[in-house]
Every structure is written in structure tokens, then in C-alpha cells.
């Protein structure tokens, strides 16, 4: 997709940057609890001449635009870091960010920020990680009070006064409706877990870890929440169902990194994939298959499974870290960058460049003037309250995710096809042990 013009971004800065300070004392999340660099740390020198970003970040402190802003993120492919460095430089910002050959994944990003203690800003992650940061689970990661100009445009995707949504993603269940799939039959489920009784061949991932895999598990387990269950707040029937999903599903070993390939090749009728890359994958589907999926925005031989519950969304957020020894002018520069990056114009440009969907509703309107794509119109059960609790499902996932990971690891879920363990004796399991990390 074409890139938005740099001129538009500069104009945005002239109009909106000057009033990017502020803050709220609330730390309660409203929505929470929905590719070339060398592989080293990259620091871009800033071009400050005539830059609109040199305007004050708030009404009292002039930002130090010579300050190098250290950023941590898991949304850091080489394409993304290169784009961000170049666009930030054009706006007068110095930034330093590692690509994913140095830091890969949300766990690594958070751990590095916590251990290095040199971060000014963190973006990406998901509600689970942000909930942990907000709750103070990382000793060296504290957020400054901050409310951007665009805070009112991100809906419920915010931790008031602390962190604000920038990108929405979800997981999708897709199916072929040609002769390699349902042969014209439509699929309607009540829950994600109904796939195990669909009568069709489905793909399943081959490892426990990974953000997309975790989100698929969260979608599969949604119908089985039980706050009184010792099995990580999930009923035993839920774990039995997830086992069946593994046992009867097709993983393909290392041939499939994610679920698009097996569906695109016609090896399965149903698969799971993440929203942000889907349309780009379908555009290029014929490059890797003799039986490709066709019709990017108007599906020809595939569709979304109609699931009454909806799907599990996550949002990536941005927050300003409280860095020891940073001056007020340097902090003002960090806030100015965050204000700029989360603005409608920049998030629309980011979304167009990388096929992501912005939390910022004004950015979404710019990006999709003809209407929101179907994959982002699905109901979001991550924000539904879990019966018997005062928590949203996203918060419930954040609370129980370590237990779920331990259960799946200890029982051997998501094995390679030729290494299937025996099914557990579900009636005689010590859940108090299984929910703990072993070794």
C-alpha cells in the first residue's frame, strides 16, 4: 500500500503538537481487565531545522529536541523500525529502538526494559503485559501521568492517565468454502471451541508460546470460564476440549509458521490467523499455492466462520516510562513524540503501511473511508465481563495466563504430530501442581 505523504504528517504537527501535555491520576484501565536494519540498536539523528515538532510539548516546558528517546517495543520488525526512525527524524525527533533481531516478542521487550532501566517509552504489547506494568509487577517499569490530545478517540482502549491504545488486533477463524473446504456449506458456531465438533479438518498451532497462539487459546477457552475451578479458572471440560483441539487438529510441524499456509494450500478446511496480516497474505496467496485463497475484501473461496461469541481482541498501547534522571525538558520531548505517534494522521499512515487497524477512531476513518473491514466488525468478547467476577475477559486472561501456560506445558499440549503424549486422566489430576511452573 502507498505511504501517506510526509507533508501531511508535518501539517498535522503544526496543528496539533503544541498541546500534548496533561495527565490524570487514575490508573484504572477502562478497556482492560480487545521489514532494513543491521540487527543492532539504531539511533537516528534528528533534522531539527524548521520542524513543527520543536513546538512546546505542554504549556510550561520547552521539549529538548536534541534528546534521544529510547523506545522498547515488540512491534519492531525491521520494516517498522526503519519507517518509524525515518518519519520521526522528519519531525525532529531523535529515537533509538531495537529491531526484532535484538528484541523479539513482548516478553523480551518488557524484560529488557525492566533490566536495562534506560527506557523512555514503551509501545505495543497487549492487555496482559500492560496490566502487569500498571499493577507494578515490574520493579523498574513505572509510567508517568500523561493524557494525550487524542485520548478521547480511542474508546475503551485506555488506562486512564497512563497508557493509550494505538493498534487493535484480533484472531480469526477462517474456512474454505470451495471443494477443498466445506463445498459451499456455511459455518456457524456459538463458540470458538465448537470447531472440534465441526466435522471438518482444522489447523492447530504446534507450540504453547507466542502472542498469536496465546490469543487463540484465549478464544478457545472463553466458553469455559469458571472462577471457582482450581484448573486456572477454567472448567475441566474446557481443558478436555482444548486437548481435543490439539489431538484432532493438523499442525504440519515446521511447514506452517501460522495458520494461513495450510488453509491457502487446501490442507485444511478451517484455520486460525491474526487479523493484521490477513489481507496482505491473500493478495499474495497465489505465490505460495496452486490452490490459493481468492478475493481479498470480497471473498471468493473463503470466509470468516460466523461465531456468535465473536472473537478475542488485543490492543497495543503506548505509555511514557518514568526514567530516573531525565529532565523535565527531556520528558516533554518524550511526551511530544508519543503525542505525535498516536495522532490520527500518523496512526493512519502506520496502519496503511503495515496493514494494522488503529484504535484511534479518527485514524480508522481516514484509513477506511468506505467502511471498516469485516474482520474488525466482529464482536469483541475480550471486553465482556466474566460471570461471577467484576473483571473483563481480558483482565481474567491476564490474571490466569501464567497458570494456563503452566497447565499446557506440564500436560504436553501442542505437541509435534509424531510425539503425542497420552491423554491425561482428567479425573485424577493435581491442579495445584499443574498450575505451577515445573523445574
Predicted regions: what is each one?
Residues 55-63, 126-174, 181-194:
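Hinge/lid segment of periplasmic solute-binding proteins
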Residues 316-392:
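Mature extracytoplasmic/periplasmic domains
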Residues 226-302:
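Ligand-binding pocket segment of bilobal, Venus flytrap-like solute-binding proteins
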Residues 383-439:
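Conserved C-terminal helix/tail region of periplasmic/extracytoplasmic solute-binding proteins
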Residues 21-24:
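Bacterial signal peptide processing site
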Residues 15-19:
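C-terminal motif of bacterial Sec signal peptides marking the signal peptidase cleavage site
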Residues 148, 152, 169, 240-246, ...:
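Periplasmic-binding protein-like
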Residues 59-131:
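Early extracytoplasmic/lumenal segment of secretory-pathway proteins
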